[in-house]
Structure formats: C-alpha cells, structure tokens
C-alpha cells in the first residue's frame, strides 16, 4: 500500500533557513553559505521521508521565499521594472521580486487561500515574454536522485498559476489572465521533458484553485491545459493535487475527466463532501490520493477513523489504486514535536507536527496493506481517549455560559449615534480627533527586559519599573505631539494574540512550533486545547496605570475573539464558532473590568476577521454571522458613555461591509493608506455608517516619513467622502515595527495636518 506527502515545511526544525536567509540579506554570509544550508535541509527531509517508508516523496516544494515566486522564475515572468534580459534567474533578481531593493518596490504579497501563509502574486499582461528561466525543479529532482531518493517533482499547475495572478500595472484590470495559457504551456512542456529525461516517473501538479467558486470557462481552462500537455506527459504517472476544501460537483467532474492525468489528490479533512462525490463515481484504473492526515493543524490523527475511511474508499477504487496522503502540504503546521521540551506531557501526547504526520501516513498505509503496527495504533487510541476525558479540556461553567448565548442577539441597547452623543459629552473631543492604533516601537532594550523577566533573570519589581518607565515615555511623547486619544504603547506585549493566550486557560504554547508566514518570517500560533476562560484581569493594571499619567482619554487595548481564533491552532473536537464564543466571553469580562477601572475608550482589534472567510461564497453567511456575533458579545454590557473602537487590517471590504456595520462598534479604524478613496466610498455608498471612521492616513509598513501637506491632502480627500463629525485621523496600523526617529516626525506631521482643516 502506497503513501504520499503533498509537501513539507522548508524552514527547518529550528528555523535554520530563516537565519541563513537573514544573514545573507544582511551581507553577513555568501550565496554559497545559503545554498549549503538549503541543501542540508532538503536532504534531511528526503531522508526522513524515505526512512519513514513514504513511497511518493515530493521535491521542489522547498523554496527560498515562495513556491509561486519559484513558478514565476521558472516561466521567466519577471515584471518589466526589474529589467530582466533572459538567462537563468539568480538570487539578486529573485529576492528583488520578493522584497524589493533600494530602487524598486517588491511584487505584491497576498494570503495563500485561507491559510496564514502568503505568496508573491504574479503580475501578468499581454506583453510578458515567457521563457524557461529557472531549472530549480529539475535540479532538485537530480539532487535527490544523487542521494538515492527518487522523488515526485511538484509544480504549481498552469491554470492555478494564472488564476492566482493579477493584471500588471498599466494592464486593464479586466485582462483575461487565462488567455495566457497557450503562452505558458510551452515552458511547462520543456520542464516536463527535462524531468522525464532526468528519470522522473511521477509528476505532481498542484491545482488548488479547483476548490474555489469557478465559472464554466475557468473549468474549461483545466480541460484545455491538460489536453494540450497530454502528449508531453505520456509515459508518466501524473497526479493533480487539490486541497483546502471540497470540490463542487462540476469541478470534481472536470478534474476526474482530465486527459493524461492518472491520479487525483483530495483534502478529505476539510473536504467532507468530496467523499460523497468519490463514492458516487470514480474513474476506473485511476489512482486516488486520499488526504486523511490533516496538514493544517497540530492534533494527532484519529487513526482508527482514518483507517475506516480508507477501507471504505478501497472498495470503490481498488486496493492497489489507493494512496494514503496528507490533506495538503505540511508547510502549514509546525515541524517536529521532538523539539518541544517544555510542553506538558499530557498535552504533548495529543499532538502531531509535520514529522509525526509523516509517520501517521506511513502507519495508515501499512495498516491498509495488512501490516498494522498494533502498538502505534493503541498508543494513538490511548492519547485520543485521554484528550476526550481530560478535566483540563472541559470547564462546566464555560460550557454553560457559552450555551446560554444561544438565541440572543447581544447588541448594545442604543444606536451608535445616540452613544456617540453620550461619549462626546464625556470625552469632549475636537473635530477630526487624532489617535494611534496601539503599539509603539519596541526597542532592543525593551525586548531584552521582557526576555530576561520571562527567563527569571530579573525580578518582577525591576520588570514593572522598566515597563512603567516605557509607558510614561510614550504617554509624554503623545501629549507633546498633542494627540487626542492616547495609548499606552503595549511595551509589555510580545504579540497581540500570545499576550492574551498566555493569560487565558485552555491555551498552550510551544517553544519551536514555528510556521512560515512569508519569506523568512515565521509565526508561532498558540494551541487552543480546552475550554477558554479568564482566571484574572489581563490588561487592567497597565491601562489604569497609563490613564493615571494623563488627563486625556487612554485607550484600553484588547485583541478580539475572531483574531485570537484565526491566529491559533484551534481544537478540532468542537465547532470553531463554539470556541470563538468562549473567547468572546473572556474578552467581555476584561472589557467590563477596564470600564470599571475608569477606562472610557476600549479598542477591540479584529485584524483577522476577514481571514477566516471560507473559500467559497456558500460558507460566508454562517461564518460572518458568528464572527460578528462574537465581537458584539465582547462589549454588549458596556455603557453608552464608553467608546468601543475596533481596528481592521485589510483593504478589501466591499463584500463584507454589511457585516462590519453589524459589528456595531462606535469607531472603526482601518488599514487604508494603500487603497485610498475606493474603500471610503464603500462605507458611504448606500450605507449610512453612523459610527466614527479612521481610515489610516499613512502607511506604517514603510520607513518613509509623509510630509504634512501630503497628509493634509489625503484628509481633504477623505472629507470629500466622509462628514467631518465622523472622521478620525490615525496611522493605518500599530507602530511596533518602526523606529522612534521615524514615528515622531510622522505623527507630528499627522497632527499638524489635522489641525488647520
């Protein structure tokens, strides 16, 4: 019985690639040094899979930055601004496209489906000259072969590549990207021919866009593309892999009818309906790669349940045509549980990171072949039983409180305009009030203090003194700049989710559970393993301390429940919305305690609300309903005179504007500096959004200091769309990643720009 892994994390068990990349970018090491680290990582991954008995081992899933950018390099689809004149694409050009350079901006980056990974978006148009310009797929296949490992080269499929692209600057937005299919297929043919010549017997095409809402002409593009590739692919085993959701019946029919394709891969963890499609008909003689091991979470697989699913599929496709696989690439999970020395043993027994998932895939394949490892299966069953019955997972009081939420709307009793009137009487703010989003620069010294306190190298007294001084500095600075609503700067927080998770019960934290977000940047999501509750106040001490330093309003700063949920590894033994409601109740307790402590403005950030949107429209309604409801729960008991702010971090609101209004916040600040007036008109078109709105007036992601006149001009443009009594003036995001010598003049210019208007 055969086994397969869709893809594997690239960073290394201790983020070796991250450190090698950053050292190279900083000019501290050579290209050869970087290549050596990368080659060592690849060979250890291939060896690990070979040792685990995996039959179909992927190659070319490694990337120095991103697999879509690798495909752009393979196709020579370099945007004109980089002055590419052909030849093999090297590090300089590759990293310029990814990160920009001194004189040229980077290509755009956006989220990879609904994961927390980001890819570099190809910029295409009718003028692009496609040519085979990176031989990486073939080189890596040969590299593995030289190590004695026969791999399956993985390519981003041609249709998904185009569907994930955008029209380049200067090209009509409506340019039909799929019209470029005849231009890119010749390059794919060259790559396939080279792989064949190098000895490859199986090739994997990732076509994840098949799980999206597709129109008939888009589905036809898949049929056309693989019909065109058919003769080049003859003699090869060809796998088309899909993941992240189930397929519509039309997409399923298109996929299993593709010419020249011998195997189809499905995500059977998130794609629950796909199972029914397979059962209703699967082409005879073709292989089914069954993704039963979850590539997107960190929980141990329920091996007995997976085995039952696989056995039911075996009777449909035949014993020799079924391959056990992961639901998607393991890129989206942590690397290896072995490196978690501080994690509690009981919780650890419930988990499986990428290295453990490879073993699960192999164990399932062996069990199907009649060589079941009884000890492995019974250890798994024992871990699952312990997780089900552990008193650490269940909290009766939380269950009861969450159950009590059903059937109620949880909305503040009065309208937003009545509340704003009450708040204005209390806060007495000027027209065009100024504020910031929350965090201030985190200096090396500040990080050192936090690190030493965590490692118990300094006393609590020393820690509190240092943080207090930092808050005092930030408050004083804002008063000098004449900002109207202040923040305490969040010097005590390392991360907006981790800070709260560490103080809530039901959360666990890893030491090395890093997952790639983009390039060398990794995130370490908390693990929500049990019912969530708040043992004691989390932010009240620091916020009231900050308020005692000024007569101006001080914002309390909380992270919203949907963002905490979407940026964590979430328990899979109850629906996501139930976990979200539990977090909402904990944040509600905190908001009410802040209000009691005299904090009159409370910001509840929902930076990641949009990130949780299901991939297909059919799932949007239910998600938005419970996400918005969760936000409203957090402040339902707050008095009219207390102002609730929220902050959101993306520019595409058109399709969810009604849900944002339904959140019923008093003031909403948004990351708008890049998308400008488009977004503002959304708030006005047909929707009289009565609340305050603070579209970011400058982009904090850039070190550039915007001149006063430019900011004033931007504010005037905003006033052409929004009334002056609702407009707030603020940067577009927190200032944590900037330096004080950038922040001070930028905020000063912002306040000056708002005053005369």
Swiss-Prot record:
L-methionine binds at residues 437-439, 490, 605. Its cofactor is Zn(2+). Gene3D superfamilies: 3.20.20.210. Signal peptide: none annotated. Zn(2+) 2 binds at residues 658, 662. The active site is at residue 701. Pfam families: Meth_synt_1 (PF08267), Meth_synt_2 (PF01717). GO terms for molecular function: 5-methyltetrahydropteroyltriglutamate-homocysteine S-methyltransferase activity; methionine synthase activity; zinc ion binding. Keywords: Allergen, Amino-acid biosynthesis, Metal-binding, Methionine biosynthesis, Methyltransferase, Transferase, Zinc. Pathway: Amino-acid biosynthesis; L-methionine biosynthesis via de novo pathway; L-methionine from L-homocysteine (MetE route): step 1/1. The keyword Kinase does not apply. Disulfide bonds: none annotated. Catalyzes the transfer of a methyl group from 5-methyltetrahydrofolate to homocysteine resulting in methionine formation. This is 5-methyltetrahydropteroyltriglutamate--homocysteine methyltransferase. It comes from Kali turgidum.
């Amino acid at each position: 019985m055969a086994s397969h892994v869709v893809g594997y994390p690239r960073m290394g068990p201790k983020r070796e690639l991250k450190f090698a990349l950053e050292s190279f970018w900083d000019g501290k090491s050579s290209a050869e040094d970087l290549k050596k680290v990368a080659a060592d990582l690849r060979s250890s991954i291939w060896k690990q899979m070979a040792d685990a008995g995996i039959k179909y081992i992927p190659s070319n899933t490694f990337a120095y930055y991103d697999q879509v950018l690798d495909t752009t390099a393979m196709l020579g689809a370099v945007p004109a601004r980089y002055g590419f004149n052909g030849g093999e694409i090297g590090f300089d050009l590759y990293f310029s496209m990814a990160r920009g350079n001194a004189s040229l901006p980077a290509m755009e980056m956006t989220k990879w489906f609904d994961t927390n990974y980001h890819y570099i978006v190809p910029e295409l148009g009718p003028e692009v000259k496609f040519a085979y310009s990176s031989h990486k797929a073939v080189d890596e296949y040969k590299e593995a072969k030289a190590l004695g490992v026969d791999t399956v080269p993985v390519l981003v499929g041609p249709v998904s590549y185009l569907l994930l692209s955008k029209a380049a600057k200067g090209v009509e937005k409506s340019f039909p990207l799929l019209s470029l299919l005849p231009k890119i297929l010749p390059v794919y043919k060259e790559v396939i021919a080279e792989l064949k010549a190098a000895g490859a017997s199986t090739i994997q095409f990732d076509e994840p866009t098949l799980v999206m809402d597709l129109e008939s002409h888009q589905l036809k593009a898949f049929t056309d593309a693989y019909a065109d590739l058919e003769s080049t692919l003859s003699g090869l085993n060809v796998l088309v892999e899909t993941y992240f959701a189930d397929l519509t019946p039309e997409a399923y029919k298109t996929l299993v009818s593709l010419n020249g394709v011998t195997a189809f891969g499905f995500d059977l963890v998130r794609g629950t309906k796909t199972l029914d499609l397979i059962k209703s008909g699967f082409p005879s003689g073709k292989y089914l790669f069954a993704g039963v091991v979850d590539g997107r979470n960190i929980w141990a697989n329920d091996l007995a349940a997976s085995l039952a699913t696989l056995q039911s599929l075996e009777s449909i496709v035949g014993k020799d045509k079924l391959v056990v696989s992961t639901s998607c690439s393991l890129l989206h999970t942590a690397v290896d549980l072995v490196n978690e020395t501080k994690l509690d043993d009981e919780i650890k027994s419930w988990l499986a990171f990428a290295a453990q998932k490879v073993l699960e895939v192999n164990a399932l394949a062996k069990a199907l072949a009649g060589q079941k490892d009884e000890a492995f299966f019974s250890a798994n069953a024992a871990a699952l039983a312990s997780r089900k019955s552990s008193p650490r997972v269940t909290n009766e009081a939380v269950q009861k409180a969450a159950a009590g939420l059903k059937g109620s709307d949880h909305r503040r009793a009065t309208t937003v305009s009545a509340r704003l009137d009450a708040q204005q009487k209390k806060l007495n703010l000027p027209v065009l009030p100024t504020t910031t989003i929350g965090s201030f620069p985190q200096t090396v010294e500040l990080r050192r203090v936090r690190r030493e306190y965590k490692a118990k190298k300094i006393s609590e007294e020393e820690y509190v003194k240092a943080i207090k001084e930092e808050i005092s500095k930030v408050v004083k600075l804002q008063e000098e700049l004449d900002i109207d609503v202040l923040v305490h700067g969040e010097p005590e927080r390392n991360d907006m989710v981790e800070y709260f998770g560490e103080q809530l019960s039901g959360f666990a934290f890893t030491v090395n559970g890093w997952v790639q977000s983009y390039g060398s940047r990794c995130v370490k999501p908390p693990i929500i393993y049990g019912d969530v509750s708040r043992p004691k106040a989390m932010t009240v001490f620091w916020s009231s301390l900050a308020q005692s330093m000024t007569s101006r309003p001080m914002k309390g700063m909380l992270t919203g429940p949907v963002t905490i949920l979407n940026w964590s590894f979430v328990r899979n033994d109850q629906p996501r919305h139930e976990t979200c409601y539990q977090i909402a109740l904990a944040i509600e307790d905190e908001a009410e305690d802040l209000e009691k402590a005299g904090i009159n403005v409370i910001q509840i950030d929902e930076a990641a609300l949009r990130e949780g949107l299901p991939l297909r429209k059919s799932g949007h309604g239910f998600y938005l309903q419970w996400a918005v409801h969760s936000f409203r729960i957090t402040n339902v008991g707050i008095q009219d005179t207390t102002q609730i702010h929220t902050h959101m971090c993306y520019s595409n609101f058109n399709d969810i504007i009604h849900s944002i209004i339904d959140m019923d916040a008093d003031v909403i600040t948004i990351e708008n500096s890049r998308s400008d007036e488009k977004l503002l008109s959304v708030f006005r078109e047909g929707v009289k959004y009565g609340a305050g709105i603070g579209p970011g007036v400058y982009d904090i992601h850039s070190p550039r200091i915007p001149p006063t006149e430019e900011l004033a001009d931007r504010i005037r443009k905003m006033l052409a769309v929004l009334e002056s009594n609702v407009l707030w003036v603020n940067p577009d995001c927190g200032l944590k990643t900037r330096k004080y010598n950038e922040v001070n003049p930028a905020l000063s210019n912002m306040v000056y720009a708002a005053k005369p208007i």
